[in-house]
Amino acid sequence: MRKTVAFGFVGTVLDYAGRGSQRWSKWRPTLCLCQQESLVIDRLELLHDARSRSLFETLKRDIASVSPETEVVSVEIELHNPWDFEEVYACLHDFARGYEFQPEKEDYLIHITTGTHVAQICWFLLAEARYLPARLIQSSPPRKKEQPRGPGEVTIIDLDLSRYNAIASRFAEERQQTLDFLKSGIATRNPHFNRMIEQIEKVAIKSRAPILLNGPTGAGKSFLARRILELKQARHQFSGAFVEVNCATLRGDTAMSTLFGHVKGAFTGARESREGLLRSANGGMLFLDEIGELGADEQAMLLKAIEEKTFYPFGSDRQVSSDFQLIAGTVRDLRQLVAEGKFREDLYARINLWTFTLPGLRQRQEDIEPNLDYEVERHASLTGDSVRFNTEARRAWLAFATSPQATWRGNFRELSASVTRMATFATSGRITLDVVEDEINRLRYNWQESRPSALTALLGAEAENIDLFDRMQLEHVIAICRQAKSLSAAGRQLFDVSRQGKASVNDADRLRKYLARFGLTWEAVQDQHSSS
């Protein structure tokens, strides 16, 4: 049978009752722990400092009189400040690491009633992390007034038991609410995007380091940056504002002035001093979209502001300070800009700690339907006009939106515009098939203008030498290739009829040879698509 071993602090307040016989009239948690009829403590290891040695000896004698089978062991520790979390945790952590546990022979309990609140928290953390393979035990005084000298009650808390899963499930529910918040409540289905949001959630809560968001225009970089700030504000991590600027709009002296501010007379026309966006973001978040467009001087000053949280306003010889978190957005490959000498390598290294690439809408076809529902609801909240799709109209729009013809070059911004147009033309709050067909034609027209550029990007001037008949067919083939996961999958879709009558098929080889007629390869089509 395993022995029961308990650890605890000598309670300098609760365990102290003087030295006379009157001490037996006071409830003392450590003594009463050893008086429980249903629990026999075989060994009690009491932690105390040198000043509490006398109190420990008194407890040891009293325990021997009420529970002679209990061995009481002195564990002398040195604590300068029992309310200092770092010191107490380090002390108990060292104790746990140095103790020779024998869980196959002994059952361990941690008495958390004595000791400071800091000590109780540290006991809990060490038990939860399994540095101490023990259950928690809490003692309480007797409830009945007619039994003032009774041993009271004890409660054992096993952090491994399923009854405490409810606590863990609360954290899980809260975390899911956080993920939904970052996604604006949209039930996204794309696994890559969902994994990325889970990572962003952890970074947003635990880190204040710069975050770099890559992705095409309209993929939601600015929106996500704002949600990250709101999440931090909800957790009381930030109290400042969200400050946003597109760096592509900053040129010349106005770039310095806009970002870092200026003093009066810094340049022609500077009649008043200006605070600048970095100072406006103090205590909050600064979102620099298209950060790759910043000039060399601005990059150097931004690096100093990130690292030292100080900078010089334009035209000033006095430093100012601003403590903000930076989120940068870009559609360009900053690594390539660094290689070309157009972007500072040290700045890139500083903002590249947390990098996330937001996929475009075309890469998240599973999320088109839930985002459609979100945009419909958003339109209703903005305008007060509730609209709904007819079943046939909804089916037709989704079929086109997820087809190879739908390039969604404007991504979610374009999807939002599409919903706005259909909602505007809705009759009596219903989006009909006629409205959807008009919208599909409008989108087709918009996207047709961009199609030749895909061929031109692949073939250059040679694209002009291809007949219109072949060019239109090739464009459609390329669109399907870009939607397919593999060469074989694209071949099966393209040769879906002719392959039925053949005993053996090699769709991948047929497609490879077709592309080769125009000097193209599967790899070239995919590479150009991923970089576009």
UniProtKB/Swiss-Prot annotation:
InterPro entries associated with the record: AAA+_ATPase, P-loop_NTPase, RtcR, Sigma54_dep_tscrpt_act_RtcR, Sigma_54_int, Sigma_54_int_dom_ATP-bd_2
A GO CC term attached to the entry: protein-DNA complex
Single Gene Ontology BP annotation: positive regulation of DNA-templated transcription
SUPFAM superfamilies: P-loop containing nucleoside triphosphate hydrolases
Domain Sigma-54 factor interaction: 186-424
Protein known as: Transcriptional regulatory protein RtcR
Organism: Escherichia coli (strain K12)
UniProt-annotated binding residues for ATP: 215-222, 281-290
CDD domains: AAA
Main function: Transcriptional repressor of the rtcAB genes. Interacts with sigma-54.
MF annotations from Gene Ontology: ATP binding; ATP hydrolysis activity; cis-regulatory region sequence-specific DNA binding; DNA-binding transcription activator activity; DNA-binding transcription factor activity
Record bears the keyword Kinase: no
Keyword Disulfide bond: no
Keywords annotated in UniProt: ATP-binding, DNA-binding, Nucleotide-binding, Repressor, Transcription, Transcription regulation, Two-component regulatory system
Residues of the DNA-binding region: 485-504
Annotated gene: rtcR
